[in-house]
């Protein structure tokens, strides 16, 4: 064992400096040592000043060099140690896999070991720890929630009291005024006049004891202040509040606008439904079609449907969707549809339209009906809750999954009066930029309008000729009297102007719509500008700007969108570049383009592929084409207009949602809920709150959803209003403390792949995630960028899309966006190269695995495991065991259906598990150490807490510990009892006074030119240096009211999801599992064939072990790096290679096969010869092992028996077999010390007629053990390595032919052979010692005796054991010592005579050997003799077979 070397004292030295000093002084060694499942690489002690929290410790590295947790942390997090280390063969396979991708040994993490005292775990494992933390955080809310699901609401009131505030309606019909809702559970709903203001005008709450109704004082005319919030009572009471989309209702509750979190638990039935019966975006269109079809059928059933409708219903066109069984297992999320799905109840929502009114008197006139409608929603919501909540607990059984919802549903964002300034500035900036571009467009419009009197000019212009110039005629009124001057007719819209100009007006004032006087035309045209709807998004804008694609004018097609016109002689260039040509076949549209025979038209590229239409070439997605000159204009300010459109795109899309945010300022709140410090500067803006209306589980992956804050972009210099997040400001005395989980979902995917090897970094993507660097180009994004020839930043889109299940088509389309000049063939080739390098090749080999699998790529293991998750009957996440929605279960979808969504679910839902664990860990640490903080918001992999200034470093430490616990939980649940140090902690914790992505972002935008002061970012080393300011002291006594109570929480260990999958994959055959891993590693077809051959022909009992050279014995892969085993350790025994065993088996099998038709003594003699030959071969192979077999040789003193091998049509072969006597003697050479006895010499007598000269001479079949053949092969193999394998294959083919021919002949021989009665019982060979038993002997032993065994015709001198019973051969224990040679099964067609009658296809060599040894799988014909021998009869016996799962060769066989 390596003794840790402690650092010398290095005053004022950093950790890195200390490490360099030690290396130069040679105070520790870098040589790896084999010790258990870890190698202790270096033993640097961390050098920190004693005022810090760090302590000295030892660095630990795993078997492939990835740095793990320090010894100090490891002992705290894994008190039991590594109870399930990776097997040596898995380590070797991982090294082989990494070496093939040029990753082995390229470890880069050189950080010193991190060590400090952690809060004690509550239990021995993280699973027990988090179970107890989850139960503690969930109670008493979980108990209340279960009780409320079993309870029933009282009947709804039949009449309502018109009184502001709360009114209680008792069961007996009495009412009480000004009584707040009581109890620990309620169902709640509010109604809002949403077009007038965002505040509630009425609310209803139902409890098991009573009903409550609330009316706004403003609604009843008691005040003109519309900002009325609903009070709910004491915020310290533990209470569950159930509602459908409860986040919307929560924003109307008074007590929620407080820095201190209430004890309310908001349970959203919409979220519960989505988690249990939600649908993915791909399913929604099909479901909507099904819904429409169902509504039509119901309409036809209840009404007298029209003939056309009946024909549609009877025509079967509506039943296509019904084939999708999942349709009946899901619904969309509205309360109406959810109630119909779960309760089969239809809700009338028509009266809801009344709330669209802006006059409160309209509401008052129907107040009773509206209150009844509101109460009905409450009642239905509770009924839905009674169904979905128990189902949710079944789908997401872990207490953490429930407890985390309380915090996710109670997020809060503090703001101040700068919020109003932000909206005003952003809107003004947008209007100013819009006005500037519009002025230029108006100028172009006026310039174009000047051509109305010159048709030659506008018809010859390819852009202007597309405009509709008709409608310029002026209708004249008939003169009333003869001789009167004609006057223009009245009520004409802009007479004298072309139609395209008229279409720009929605409405024209009457004074500007008439005929212009010549001297006032320009003045009137300018006055009309304010009524013209002309922006860069208008259809006419690209024509006014005269846009071109590579110099060719743009043309609008009603059928295909924007296209560009190319002369027909130049069209071939664009066709070769895979631009999409269009054919105008519809006679009703695009007449002009269809008649143009001189040009060819091509669609503008679109990000969604060639089938999508481009409807606006001025969209921000086309800005890169402008910058590259592909898209151009005759006017220089066309690019400016495009940039303006891109700059304002965010504000245009989000302005309404941002303006409609419900901000409640503190001057609207009670004094106890205001947060301005008394010592604050008088200039401090008034503060307020925004409660994001979050749906805690808004997608099938259980991700939170919110329209504004969870989709807000980061501040960009060219985007108006993109500083939105920075407008969230911490109140005085508070800060935001948070972090981004580094590559959260990428790490989850990689650790799922690492689980195959039980080793962090064991698969390529895992290694790149942990150890890859941008500088060396070994990280995932750099590898992808180099393959695609794009930037590293752009490569992230490809990587995450692929991890989420996106296919080759997605990569091709995305690549075209980054490089439009590529042809479709080029993009497909590059994308294919990427997927070959990452996902690998798709392979379907049932002999290796039950379903198709990926192999040879850096991510093959990940995708195989993700698809394994997706294909389960009830898929569950690997950590918390959360189930998939019922609509995506495999039983309800077609095979392979929605596979992308199911793979995406496995990753993203695991990411949600990560977030939930992090939140519950923080909840525990907050209550245990009295931290003054609460969750502010989470955005996927970002988490931000609002903390008091004095506690900011302690909260930062708590975040690091929570993250460490969460990562270890993931590692343990996937089967790896360790954690890399590089991912154990957040790379940085941000401490900031505003909400933004990075603390050093200035957040300068067109609407915010003033930079925002930077925040603070600290890593784990800096936190440790803070000392007591960051210490979570165990001596702190938690507040009694909220202290964790973990002592009496029961815990039952559960079987991890990954363990179940692994056990199912191994299915009791570890060697088959290892072969499957090797198949996933290889990208070579030839190597795959060798693995398949090994699967078919090798015994399934062999085991990999470390040989003396440090390699896995028998592994067919070329080793790239050896395991550095200690030289003092004896080499583990190894098995003979498959090819060598083939040689031994083939020799004995051939002798067995040609002996068919001979008498039993001859068969025994040939068996003995075969065993001796096999032993001789096995001795050579096992010479270097501990258990050496007997060195047996064959001496040719007597010629071998002469046997008839294959029946033929010649007269010689048809003659009866005659007897000749031959004696075969086998002797033992000098035996090894471990041998206890020699092999007895065997003498047998046989009579047969010679049929072949070669066999008469006693020459055996050619064998690889023949010295002459071996010497020749050795010479040839130096120049042709595959020669030996080829020869072995041919010899096996010969053996297969002879054995099958013999099987056919055996039946004929047994019908003509007259056996003699036995004089002694059948002999039983003495049990040989296991170390001296060869594979050939095991194969040639019968596994069972038929019901009517053939009697032995000649007595032998062998001892018999009458009590012995036939047993199934046991596995040979000797492991391999030589590598497996390449082997390809012969595919030559054998003659029909080589098959038995029942056999439908040729047998493999392994089946032939088995057939020769145990009697095969066909009906057997045996000769039975009477006891006296006087009467001879032939009987045909069909044994009663029973199946056995796996035979010696992995095939199902049958035994009697």
UniProtKB/Swiss-Prot annotation:
Transit sequence range: 1-41
Q: Which Pfam families match?
A: DNA_pol_A, DNApol_Exo
Its UniProt entry gives the catalysed reaction(s) as:
DNA(n) + a 2'-deoxyribonucleoside 5'-triphosphate = DNA(n+1) + diphosphate
GO term, biological process aspect, one = mitochondrial DNA replication
User: What molecular function does GO assign, one term?
Assistant: DNA binding
In terms of InterPro entries, this protein maps to: DNA-dir_DNA_pol_A_CS, DNA-dir_DNA_pol_A_mt, DNA-dir_DNA_pol_A_palm_dom, DNA/RNA_pol_sf, DNApol_Exo, POLG_palm_dom, RNaseH-like_sf
Q: What is its EC number?
A: 2.7.7.7
Q: Just give the chief location class.
A: mitochondrion
Where does it live in the cell?
Mitochondrion
SMART domains assigned: POLAc
Gene3D superfamilies reported for this sequence: 3.30.420.390, 3.30.70.370, 5' to 3' exonuclease, C-terminal subdomain
Annotated SUPFAM superfamilies: DNA/RNA polymerases (SSF56672), Ribonuclease H-like (SSF53098)
What are the start and end residues of every segment in region (Disordered)? 1200-1266, 1308-1443
> Which top-rank group of organisms is this from?
Eukaryota
Residue stretches of biased makeup (Low complexity)? 1204-1239, 1346-1371, 1411-1428
**Coiled-coil regions listed in the entry:** none
Q: Does the keyword Transmembrane helix apply?
A: no
Q: Return the similarity comment.
A: Belongs to the DNA polymerase type-A family.
What is the role of this chain? Involved in the replication of mitochondrial DNA.
**Cross-referenced PANTHER family:** DNA POLYMERASE SUBUNIT GAMMA-1 (PTHR10267:SF0)
What's the name of the protein?
DNA polymerase gamma, mitochondrial
Q: Which organism is it from?
A: Neurospora crassa (strain ATCC 24698 / 74-OR23-1A / CBS 708.71 / DSM 1257 / FGSC 987)
């Amino acid at each position: 064992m390596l003794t840790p070397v402690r650092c010398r004292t290095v005053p004022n030295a950093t950790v890195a400096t200390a490490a360099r000093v030690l290396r130069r002084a040679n105070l520790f060694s870098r040589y790896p040592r084999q010790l258990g499942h870890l190698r202790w690489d270096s033993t640097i002690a961390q050098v920190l000043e004693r005022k810090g929290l760090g302590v000295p410790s030892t660095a630990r590295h795993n078997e492939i060099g990835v740095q793990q947790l320090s010894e100090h942390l490891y002992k705290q997090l894994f008190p039991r140690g590594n109870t399930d280390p990776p097997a040596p063969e898995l380590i070797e396979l991982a090294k082989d896999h990494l070496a093939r991708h040029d990753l082995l040994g390229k470890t880069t993490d050189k950080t010193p070991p991190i060590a400090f005292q952690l809060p004690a775990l509550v239990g021995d494992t993280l699973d027990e720890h988090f179970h107890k933390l989850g139960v503690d955080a969930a109670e008493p809310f979980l108990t209340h929630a279960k009780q409320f699901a079993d309870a029933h609401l009282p009947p709804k009131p039949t009449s309502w009291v018109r009184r502001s505030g709360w009114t209680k309606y008792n069961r007996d019909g009495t009412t009480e005024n000004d009584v707040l809702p009581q109890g620990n559970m309620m169902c709640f709903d509010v109604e809002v006049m949403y077009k007038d203001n965002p505040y509630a005008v009425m609310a209803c709450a139902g409890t098991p004891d009573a009903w409550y109704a609330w009316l706004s004082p403003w609604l009843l005319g008691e005040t003109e202040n519309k900002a009325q919030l609903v009070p709910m009572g004491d915020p310290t009471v533990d209470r569950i509040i159930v509602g459908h989309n409860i986040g919307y209702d929560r924003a109307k509750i008074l007590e929620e606008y407080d820095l201190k979190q209430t004890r309310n638990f908001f349970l959203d039935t919409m979220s519960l439904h989505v988690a249990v019966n939600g649908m993915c975006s791909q399913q929604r269109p099909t479901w909507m079609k099904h819904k429409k079809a169902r509504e039509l059928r119901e309409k036809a059933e209840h009404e007298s449907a029209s003939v056309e409708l009946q024909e549609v219903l009877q025509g079967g066109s509506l039943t296509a969707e019904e084939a999708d069984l999942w349709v009946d297992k899901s619904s969309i999320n509205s309360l109406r549809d959810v109630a119909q799905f779960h309760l089969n109840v239809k809700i009338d929502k028509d009266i809801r339209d009344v709330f669209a009114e802006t006059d409160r008197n309209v509401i008052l006139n129907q107040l009773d009906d509206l209150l009844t409608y509101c109460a009905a929603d409450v009642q239905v919501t509770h009924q839905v809750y009674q169904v979905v909540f128990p189902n949710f607990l079944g789908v997401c059984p872990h207490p953490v999954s429930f407890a985390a919802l309380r915090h996710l549903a109670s997020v809060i964002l503090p703001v101040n009066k700068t919020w109003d300034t932000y909206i005003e500035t952003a809107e003004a900036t947008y209007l100013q930029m819009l006005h500037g571009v519009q002025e230029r467009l108006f100028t172009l419009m006026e310039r174009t309008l000047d051509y109305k009197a010159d048709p030659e000019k506008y018809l010859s212009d390819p852009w202007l000729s597309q405009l509709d110039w008709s409608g310029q005629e002026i209708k004249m009124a008939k003169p009333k009297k003869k001789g009167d001057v004609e006057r223009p007719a009245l009520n004409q819209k802009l007479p004298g102007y072309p139609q395209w100009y008229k279409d720009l007006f929605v409405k024209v004032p009457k004074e500007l719509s008439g005929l212009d006087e010549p001297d006032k035309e320009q003045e009137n045209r300018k006055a009309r500008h304010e009524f013209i709807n002309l922006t860069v998004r208008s259809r006419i804008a690209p024509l006014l700007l005269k846009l071109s694609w590579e110099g060719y004018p743009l043309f609008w097609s009603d059928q295909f969108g924007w296209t560009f016109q190319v002369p027909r002689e130049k069209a071939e260039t664009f066709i070769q570049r895979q631009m999409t040509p269009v054919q105008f076949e519809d006679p009703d549209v695009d007449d002009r383009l269809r008649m143009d025979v001189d040009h060819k038209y091509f669609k503008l590229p679109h990000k969604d592929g060639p089938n999508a239409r481009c409807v606006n070439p001025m969209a921000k997605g086309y800005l890169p084409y402008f910058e590259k000159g592909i898209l151009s204009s005759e006017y220089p300010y066309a690019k400016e207009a495009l940039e303006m459109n891109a700059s304002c795109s965010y504000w245009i899309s989000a302005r309404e949602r941002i303006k409609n945010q419900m901000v409640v300022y503190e001057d609207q709140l009670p004094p106890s809920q205001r947060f301005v410090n008394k010592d604050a500067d008088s200039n401090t803006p008034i503060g307020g709150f925004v409660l994001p209306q979050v749906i805690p589980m808004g997608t099938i992956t259980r991700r939170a959803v919110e329209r504004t804050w969870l989709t807000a972009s980061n501040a960009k210099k060219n985007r108006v209003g993109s500083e939105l997040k920075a407008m969230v400001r911490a109140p005085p005395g508070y800060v935001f403390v948070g972090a981004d989980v580094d590559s959260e979902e990428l790490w989850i995917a990689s650790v799922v792949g690492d689980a195959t090897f039980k080793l962090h970094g064991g698969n390529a993507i895992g290694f790149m995630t942990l150890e890859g660097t941008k500088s060396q180009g070994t990280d995932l994004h750099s590898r992808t960028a180099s393959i695609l020839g794009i930037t590293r930043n752009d490569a992230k889109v490809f990587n995450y899309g692929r991890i989420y299940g996106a296919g080759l088509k997605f990569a091709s389309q995305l690549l075209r966006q980054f490089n439009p000049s590529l042809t479709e063939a080029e993009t497909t080739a590059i994308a294919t190269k990427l997927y070959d390098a990452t996902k690998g090749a798709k392979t379907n080999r049932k002999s290796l695995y039950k379903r198709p699998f990926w192999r040879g790529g850096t991510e093959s293991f990940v995708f195989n495991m993700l698809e394994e998750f997706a294909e389960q009957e009830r898929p569950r996440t690997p950590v918390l065991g959360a189930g998939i929605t019922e609509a995506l279960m495999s039983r309800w979808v077609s095979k392979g259906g929605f596979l992308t969504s199911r793979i995406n679910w496995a990753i993203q839902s695991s990411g949600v598990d990560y977030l939930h664990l992090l939140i519950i860990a923080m909840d525990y640490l907050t209550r245990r150490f009295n931290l003054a903080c609460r969750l502010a918001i989470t955005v996927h992999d970002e988490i931000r807490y609002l903390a008091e200034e004095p506690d900011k470093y302690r909260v930062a430490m708590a975040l690091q510990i929570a993250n460490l616990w969460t990562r270890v939980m993931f590692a343990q649940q996937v089967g790896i009892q360790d954690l890399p140090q590089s991912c154990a902690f957040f790379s940085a914790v941000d401490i900031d006074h505003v909400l933004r992505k990075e603390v050093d972002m200035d957040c300068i935008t067109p609407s915010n030119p003033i930079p925002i002061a930077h925040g603070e970012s600290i890593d784990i080393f800096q936190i440790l240096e803070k000392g007591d300011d960051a210490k979570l002291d165990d001596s702190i006594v938690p507040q009694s009211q909220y202290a964790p109570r973990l002592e009496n929480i029961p815990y039952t260990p559960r079987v991890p999801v990954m363990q179940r999958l692994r056990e199912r994959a191994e299915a009791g055959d570890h060697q088959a599992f290892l072969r499957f891993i090797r198949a996933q590693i290889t990208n070579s077809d030839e190597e795959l064939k060798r693995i398949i051959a090994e699967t078919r022909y090798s015994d399934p009992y062999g085991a990999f072990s470390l040989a003396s050279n440090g390699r896995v014995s028998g592994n067919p892969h070329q080793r790239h790096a050896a395991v550095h085993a200690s030289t003092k350790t004896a080499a583990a025994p190894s098995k003979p290679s498959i090819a060598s065993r083939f040689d031994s088996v083939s020799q004995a099998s051939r002798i067995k096969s040609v002996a068919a038709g001979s008498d039993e003594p001859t068969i025994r003699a040939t068996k003995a010869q075969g065993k001796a030959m096999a032993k001789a071969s096995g001795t050579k192979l096992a010479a270097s092992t501990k258990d050496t077999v007997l060195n047996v040789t064959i001496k040719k003193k007597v010629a071998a028996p002469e046997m008839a091998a294959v029946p033929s049509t010649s007269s010689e072969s048809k003659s009866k077999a005659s007897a000749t006597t031959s004696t075969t003697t086998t002797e033992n050479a000098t035996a090894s010390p471990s041998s206890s006895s020699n092999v007895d010499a065997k003498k047998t007598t046989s009579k047969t007629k010679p049929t072949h000269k070669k066999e008469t001479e006693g020459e055996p079949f050619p064998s690889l053990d023949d010295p002459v053949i071996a010497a020749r092969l050795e010479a040839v193999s130096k120049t042709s390595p595959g020669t030996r394998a080829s020869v072995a294959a041919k010899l096996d083919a010969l053996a297969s032919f002879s054995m099958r021919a013999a099987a056919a002949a055996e039946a004929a021989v047994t019908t003509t052979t007259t056996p003699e009665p036995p004089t002694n019982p059948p002999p039983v060979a003495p049990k040989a010692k296991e170390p001296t038993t060869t594979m050939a002997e095991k194969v040639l032993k019968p596994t069972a005796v038929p019901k009517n065994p053939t009697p032995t015709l000649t007595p032998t001198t062998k001892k018999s054991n009458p009590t012995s019973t036939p047993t199934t051969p046991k596995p040979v224990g000797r492991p391999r010592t030589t590598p497996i040679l390449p082997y390809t099964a012969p595919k030559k067609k054998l003659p029909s005579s080589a098959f038995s009658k029942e056999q439908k296809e040729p047998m493999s060599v392994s089946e032939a050997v088995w057939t020769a040894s145990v009697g095969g799988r066909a009906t057997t014909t045996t000769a039975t003799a009477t006891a006296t021998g006087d009467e001879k009869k032939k009987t045909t016996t069909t044994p009663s077979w029973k199946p056995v799962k796996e035979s010696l060769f992995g095939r199902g066989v049958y035994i009697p």
